[in-house]
Amino acid sequence: TYGDGVSDVDINALYEFHKKNGRRATMSAVKPDSRFGVLDLSNENEVKAFREKSDIDSGWINAGFMVLEPKVLDYVKDDTIMFEREPMEQLAKEGQIMCWKHNGFWQCMDTLRDKEKLEKLWSTNKAPWKVWKD
């Protein structure tokens, strides 16, 4: 996962979906009301392409929670590669990424406003991502 997203993604369900689909990569996807690049998906949830989101677009985005087969590391040639670009786009071209759609809570924390929103949810005991017992 990326370090800037908070979610109640069911990791076990994501992993089980990955095991069943037989692809090299499975990414979680969410449909937020915001400003992210969009995933173009087939009817079977295969990732076909990545594109920048327009003001009128409301597509699925990469939620950052992924299951990857070790072979995916072969797509990373050196430490200058942006993982979201070359490796993931190549996997999509090869039909090797599936998407697991998450309809639960997801929130990025890219801005101070995002941070304050998440802190308010936490401090008022309304944090949907807190799925464990104290």
Give the location of each predicted region.
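Active-site acidic Asp-centered loop
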Residues: 1-3
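Extended acidic/charged loop-beta regions that coordinate divalent cations
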Residues: 42
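A short, conserved acidic/glycine-rich loop-to-beta-strand motif
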Residues: 21-31
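Catalytic-core segments of class I nucleotidyltransferases/pyrophosphorylases
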Residues: 6, 11, 15-19, 32-34, ...
